[in-house]
Amino acid sequence: MEKQIEKKYYYSEIFHSIQGEGEYTGTPTAWIRFFLCNLQCSGFGQDDPTNPDTYDLPFEDFDVDSVKRVEDLPVWEKGCDSSYTWAKKFKKLMGHETPTVMADKIVDILKTDTNMNGLFLHPNSRQHQHLCFTGGEPLMITGQAASMGIYKS
């Protein structure tokens, strides 16, 4: 029987933070930010968002070779604030892993002295932690496939 090779997907970061928006504000959350987006929201923060000829897009002139990690990138005030999640020039900074490896990394960021196994239901406090897929655009077919693989793992 031939061993099937698990497909790899690009992501920009996996991190743990507190949810800051909506009904679940304040909930501890593991995040995976996928790479790729079919939207390029260049009008954000522009003086005239209706006129693309006037757009100032700092990410276009940024020297990507000046950083080694996504975490070291600046947050741009104009255009898409997460353009690094879709602009091809930043692809070399992205993680490229199988869903199984991504799932393991998600569990690892949940591990603490009181949650040694990285469970989404904290064993002591019984506090639920969430998993949020973000982007880029997690609903693109690559994000959907990776998400399903992570859930299965």
What are these regions (language model features)?
Residues E2-I5, Y9-S12, L39-S153:
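Conserved Radical SAM active-site core
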Residues T27-T29, S147-M148:
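Short amphipathic alpha-helical segment that frequently serves as the phosphate-/nucleotide-binding helix
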Residues I32:
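Residue-level signal for inorganic ion chemistry
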